[in-house]
Curated annotation (Swiss-Prot):
The species this protein was found in: Methylobacillus flagellatus (strain ATCC 51484 / DSM 6875 / VKM B-1610 / KT)
Name recorded for this polypeptide: Large ribosomal subunit protein uL22
Subunit structure: Part of the 50S ribosomal subunit.
Stated role: This protein binds specifically to 23S rRNA; its binding is stimulated by other ribosomal proteins, e.g. L4, L17, and L20. It is important during the early stages of 50S assembly. It makes multiple contacts with different domains of the 23S rRNA in the assembled 50S subunit and ribosome.
One GO CC term, this protein: cytosolic large ribosomal subunit
Alphabetical list of HAMAP family matching this protein: Ribosomal_uL22_B
């Protein structure tokens, strides 16, 4: 039994989110939540929210026992890239790139 949760359009670089995702891949869910609670990165609280959602889905939809669940897979895909312009000196313009990502977490036995 595997249950997943997806969070799309997170205002976070996929590269930065993958650093945090690698910390919890393959861990038991209680251990993963503990790691995420004490990781001082923005991506940690976002991924913690998705892991909690996947746990709630498993408990509600499948009636799974939380103590036996582990993070079977977690991956971060590149999302939409917002491009903005910042005015610079002498009539020039600088490009601002605001990356987003999609986070998918799968929990199972």
């Amino acid at each position: 039994m595997e249950v997943s949760a997806v969070l799309r359009g997170v205002h976070l670089s996929p590269q930065k989110a993958r650093l945090v995702a690698d910390l919890v891949r393959g861990k038991k869910v209680d251990q993963a939540l503990n790691i995420l609670a004490f990781t001082p990165k923005k991506g940690a609280e976002v991924i913690k929210k998705v892991v909690e959602s996947a746990i709630a889905n498993a408990e509600h939809n499948e009636g799974a026992d939380i103590d036996e669940l582990k993070v079977t897979s977690i991956y971060v895909d590149k999302g939409l890239v917002l491009k903005r312009i910042r005015a610079r000196a002498k009539g020039r313009a600088g490009r601002i790139i605001k990356p987003t990502c999609h986070i998918t977490v799968t929990v199972g036995n």
